[in-house]
Amino acid sequence: MHLPRRRRLQRNRIFFFLAVVSLLSVYQLQFSPSAIPALLTAHQHEDPVKVTSREPFRNKTSKTGNVTAAPKIRHCVYIDPEPTVPITASEDTTQRENVNESYPDEKPVYESKGEYPQDLFSVEERRQGWVVLHIFGMMYVFVALAIVCDEYFVPALGVITEKLQISEDVAGATFMAAGGSAPELFTSLIGVFISHSNVGIGTIVGSAVFNILFVIGTCALFSREILHLTWWPLFRDISFYIVDLLMLILFFLDSVIDWWESLLLLTAYATYVFTMKHNVSLEQWVKEELSKKLNAVQAASAEHMRKKSSVAVAEDGTKPADGKKLQPTTALQRGTSSASLHNSQMRSTIFQLMIHTLDPLAGAKFKDRVDILSNIAKVKADSLTGQGTKPEAEEEKQASQNTVQVTPASDSEPSKDKQKEDTPQDGQPPSDSDNSEDSSSDSEDDSDDDSTDDEENDEPLSLEWPETRKKQAIYLFLFPIVFPLWSTIPDVRNPDSKKFFVITFFGSIIWIAAFSYLMVWWAHQVGETIGISEEIMGLTILAAGTSIPDLITSVIVARKGLGDMAVSSSVGSNIFDITVGLPVPWFLYSVFNGFSPVAVSSNGLFCAIVLLFLMLLFVIISIALCKWKMNKILGVTMFALYFVFLIISVMLEDRIISCPVSV
């Protein structure tokens, strides 16, 4: 019975695909640049040419006549040169008057250089209220981008990593990061090749600040408990991020980007991927060096304490010494890549959140995370059994009071996350209350249906009719997005469609490009109506819209207790945006235009990048002042810094204030 139904579904998909292709062709023919606007622009450009060609001719004849005439008869020759100054100025004024008369609706401040189709509504009609449709369409495209990335693009990348047998760290830093940052990448491509503006730069810079400040602040505010951060993942990612930002600032000094500068940024990303490949050995080397120095310092301090205190006090004083001794080892046991958050198994898709879970901030189960990460460990256990056994034996000797058992795969995710829940935080041994809470939560999770929740993450996209009224309303709201995607792209989470992962990969790219084009186009129309530039739209609205899926996923992960994963993923996605999302369009533009440089001049973008660097420093200082804890104070501080950045960036772009660091 299922065979004819499947054939009908295949036929429907083929018919739908042909219908979409035909509609796109008709749309292209209808909205192609016609001859009438070309003639109008030609006549408009001919009029000022005629004026300028006649007036200099009159000036020349008057001057030649004055020279041939007798100076004794006409002394008014000295009066004629006086009107020559306003005559030359009148040429510019007549041109401006002709331009203003030909374009009465456009503002002189905002000039459009993009290649967009003609809108159904004029500027005056949009200012009368029809711009609401563009705003709604832009918000709707945000949801569409999130669905196509989470439901199709990221699972296809997961299949590619399985086929290529790439490790989890490298896959997370490359493919999964590309899946999370695909909208920013295509926005940058559209900004360089279609809109001819800096909307892509503004979107990436704004998205970077949004990920660092707003996402971290939201995770700190909505986390169930105070999250303790470790310094190794944050130090590793922020070090690369600072170097990349400094390179970008240096390249922006001359307001152009050469092809070799784009290659340097791509090389920086390749260095980051290489570091993630050897993350385990690098972490162990840093761990050994720090443990040697800390052991020497702690031995000296222990001897000093024994000399000054009595035997009873010395017994009490050994506990903080041992606690200090545990601090570097436990802090260094959890360094992982930033891209585990972009894993298709860890990401809760927008469609699942809106249909199956109406409260996206609801608590997720700790047991689910352990099961998912244990599956990753099983794949990596065979290849990593011989690595890291000696350093971890030393760790067990140093952390003798710790009850955590470390598996030989030191870089595997389950050992990292189990230590996160069981190991002491900030050098303090785990309390009995924490252990009781963990055991109680595990027992509660064991009683639930964990298998069904694990299957939901890998469950293919379903078009079944929901039961409740609210879910049915959301289903109807998302149906115009979900049905075309379901009809044209195979879902690789379905075992029968897993072999078509290449079609899913390229089909997702086409849909992401189409949705990104609609987003940039409608953002341009909204900005033209309101009177703001595309750079400001990218810094504010587009940056927040493209980062909302990562925001929701980061908050869910933070509420699970994975503060390191939430913070490190935010920084890791920014590294991909700056070192891939920006230089790839620039390099392609240089290649297609004879290796000519790309102009990136803007009123406030350079200063916005400098502000991004300063905000990153403020984040590091704030986390250090909060003693590496994600508490409410840190969340409020991050929100305040984000709104300060937005206000200063908009004022710089509108030239309300001048950039003090511009050259």
Curated annotation (Swiss-Prot):
Q: Which InterPro entries match?
A: K/Na/Ca-exchanger (IPR004481), NaCa_Exmemb (IPR004837), NCX_ion-bd_dom_sf (IPR044880)
Which spans of this chain does UniProt mark as Alpha- repeats?
A: 170-210, 543-574
Q: In which tissues is it expressed?
A: Retinal rods. Localizes to the inner segment of rod photoreceptors.
Reactions this protein catalyses: Ca(2+)(out) + K(+)(out) + 4 Na(+)(in) = Ca(2+)(in) + K(+)(in) + 4 Na(+)(out)
Q: Where is this region: Disordered?
A: 308-343, 384-465
Recorded GO MF terms: calcium channel activity; calcium, potassium:sodium antiporter activity; symporter activity
**Acidic residues composition-biased segments:** 434-461
List this protein's GO terms for biological process.
calcium ion import across plasma membrane; calcium ion transmembrane transport; intracellular calcium ion homeostasis; long-term synaptic depression; long-term synaptic potentiation; visual perception
Annotated membrane-spanning segments are 129-149, 174-194, 201-221, 229-253, 260-276, 472-492, 500-520, 536-556, 575-595, 605-625, 633-653
The protein's PTM annotation reads:
The uncleaved signal sequence is required for efficient membrane targeting and proper membrane integration and topology.
Q: Which UniProt keywords apply?
A: Antiport, Calcium, Calcium transport, Cell membrane, Glycoprotein, Ion transport, Membrane, Phosphoprotein, Potassium, Potassium transport, Repeat, Sensory transduction, Signal, Sodium, Sodium transport, Symport, Transmembrane, Transmembrane helix, Transport, Vision
Polar residues: bias regions: 327-343, 399-412
Function of the molecule: Calcium, potassium:sodium antiporter that transports 1 Ca(2+) and 1 K(+) in exchange for 4 Na(+). Critical component of the visual transduction cascade, controlling the calcium concentration of outer segments during light and darkness. Light causes a rapid lowering of cytosolic free calcium in the outer segment of both retinal rod and cone photoreceptors and the light-induced lowering of calcium is caused by extrusion via this protein which plays a key role in the process of light adaptation.
Protein family (similarity comment):
Belongs to the Ca(2+):cation antiporter (CaCA) (TC 2.A.19) family. SLC24A subfamily.
Q: List the protein's name.
A: Sodium/potassium/calcium exchanger 1
Q: Which organism is it from?
A: Gallus gallus (Chicken)
Lineage of the native species?
A: Eukaryota, Metazoa, Chordata, Craniata, Vertebrata
Gene encoding the protein: SLC24A1
